[in-house]
């Protein structure tokens, strides 16, 4: 009787003093401070903190997904942001990776290619188009015009996307040089400055649809939108793990042209060795606190994020912990 009473008192005491709630202190490797990815990091931090009070997700700056995937693979950070193209290259061991990385897994997707957060923007200045009678990029190739064309910085996969498209369209780097033209590597901000100063004729770089920098280019040089075409866009999308996407005719108010382009999405990756319960709980938090994620993230995320988007497949397998939660909720 005494033992039973003692046990009963112990149960009452445990009920009065419940176990401390689970908290997490995690790091997410992203890109430069400011911009879309850092805002996404803020949204993830808010969602995890709402689900597990006292938890934090620290956003660590880096040079982007090409750096984040190896960091996650080597266990230097628990989570990293990466585009579909970067993850595709990593798992295949394609340039710039020297060998395949097979120990990274997807936890959840932050945006799809269809949301057009990274869409190839391909345009020629109106003055150059009018001078040479350009209606399509094929006119530039057939006339072998000495274009000054800008793509993204070296080491940025977006530059590889742009160059691959140009080559398939008949404007390889060697061809452009033989026509008396020039290929310029620059970040998007510098591209805007160069084209506004009339030091570029054509631009070809990835950026979100109707981004302020696109609007600035439109204001300064009245560009004519160019298209990759369905065939080239499909080949480039397959090569870089993206999707063919479109700009509808008239969707940009400054040009009547529509265009076929390539869009790239982005995911959060973790090491395959991440504890299954941790992966499950992170995924659970993101789905159950999706409104917090949307409200504390970038305004564009607020328009596109859904539970189904979070569970959408990517270019590496999902982590087993994430799969377990998605299947429980009928999302996979």
Language model: regions and residue ranges:
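Bacterial N-terminal signal peptides
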Residues: 8-16
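Pocket-flanking alpha-helical
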Residues: 42-46, 58-103, 189-195, 200-203, ...
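C-terminal lobe and pocket-closing loops
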Residues: 224-281, 317-318, 325, 329
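A structural signal for short loop-to-beta-strand junctions that line the ligand-binding cleft
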Residues: 100-121, 251-260
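An extracytoplasmic/periplasmic, membrane-proximal ligand-sensing/linker region
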Residues: 169, 197, 202, 207-220, ...
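Bilobed "Venus flytrap"/periplasmic-binding protein-like clamshell domains
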Residues: 25-51, 55-59, 117-120, 124-197, ...
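Bacterial N-terminal signal peptides that target proteins for export
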Residues: 1-8
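Sec/Tat signal peptide C-region and signal peptidase I cleavage site
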Residues: 17-21
């Amino acid at each position: 009787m005494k033992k039973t009473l003692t046990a009963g008192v112990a149960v009452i005491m445990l009920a009065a003093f419940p176990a401390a709630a689970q908290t997490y202190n995690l790091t997410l490797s992203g890109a430069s401070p400011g911009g879309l990815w850092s805002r996404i990091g803020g949204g993830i931090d808010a969602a995890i903190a709402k689900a597990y009070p006292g938890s934090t997700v620290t956003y660590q700056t880096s040079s982007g997904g090409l750096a984040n995937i190896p960091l996650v693979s080597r266990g230097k950070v628990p989570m990293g942001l990466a585009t579909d193209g970067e993850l595709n290259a990593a798992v295949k061991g394609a340039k710039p990776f020297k060998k395949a990385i097979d120990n990274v897994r997807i936890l959840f997707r932050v945006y799809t290619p269809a949301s057009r957060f990274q869409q190839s923007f391909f345009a020629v200045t109106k003055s150059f188009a009018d001078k040479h009678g350009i209606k399509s990029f094929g006119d530039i190739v057939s006339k072998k015009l000495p274009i000054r064309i800008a793509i993204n910085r070296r080491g940025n996969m977006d530059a590889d996307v742009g160059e691959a498209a140009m080559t398939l369209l008949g404007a390889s780097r060697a061809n452009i040089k033989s026509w008396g033209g020039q290929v310029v590597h620059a970040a998007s901000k510098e591209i805007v400055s160069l084209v506004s100063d009339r030091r570029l004729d054509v631009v070809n770089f990835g950026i979100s649809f109707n981004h302020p920098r696109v609007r600035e280019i439109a204001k300064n040089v009245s560009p004519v939108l160019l298209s990759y075409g369905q065939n080239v866009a499909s080949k480039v999308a397959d090569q870089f793990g993206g999707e063919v996407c479109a700009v509808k005719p008239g969707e940009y108010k400054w040009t009547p042209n529509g265009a076929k382009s390539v869009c790239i999405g982005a995911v959060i990756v973790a090491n395959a060795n991440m504890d299954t319960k941790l992966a499950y709980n992170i995924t659970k938090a993101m789905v159950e606190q999706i409104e917090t994620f949307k409200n504390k993230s970038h305004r564009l995320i607020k328009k596109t994020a859904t539970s189904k988007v979070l569970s959408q497949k990517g270019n590496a397998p999902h982590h087993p912990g994430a799969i377990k939660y998605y299947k429980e909720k009928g999302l996979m």
